[in-house]
Amino acid sequence: MTSASDHVLQTEGLTKDFRGFVAVKAVNLRVRRHSIHALIGPNGAGKTTCFNLLTKFLKPSAGQILYKGKDITAMAPADVARLGLVRSFQISAVFPHLTALENVRVALQRQHGASFDFWRSKTVLDRFNGRARELLNDVGLSEFADTPAVEMAYGRKRALEIATTLALDPEMMLLDEPMAGMGHEDIDKVAALIKRISAKYTILMVEHNLNVVANLSDTITVLTRGQVLAEGNYADLSKDERVKEAYLGAGHG
């Protein structure tokens, strides 16, 4: 039986009302430590709004968010990130004309509060080289350390984004559609990477690719019309008539 201490992220009655339109309604979420938890649902189900609430880019209309037992409902996004709850992929996290190594160094610089004065900070940034190379190795990009991001294949850019997110020293990562826009080969590589890093980090992801969800996720929460419709593993949910009906004729790609 899972105890409360096993849950790194919890919500109680999480609700967001946009002037009468309820985008998220009374969502109770439990994300277990060191698990991969997927949030899925048809278009307009409330997945992105839920992510924005969890990372504090939106203020809840009602409900509570607990991270590692701490109430973060009223906290600012930057403060939540400093606690180790970090979101990736909602915007590109890389600078296209910097190399992979330079991108990770800048992320490390941000995390450690070093100066962003690029024309004077080379000595400061050089201090982070060792850790940056470790992170590139973790995501399988060691041989691309000196390659500008703009020259990297799409899947490798995603891996670099994960490396820059890891540089922020998260305990839990929220991945917003990590497979968006990828071909099959890149999807396989990034899925393998996410599986590998889940040994050290808790992952909550929104993902439309149900094959990826089936292969990666320990737990899946299905949202529809802003509410939790069902929760469980893929094998059980794929047999749930309510889940089938929610997706029947509804776009989820």
Which role does the model predict for each range below?
Residues T2-G253:
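Glycine-rich phosphate-binding loops of nucleotide-dependent enzymes
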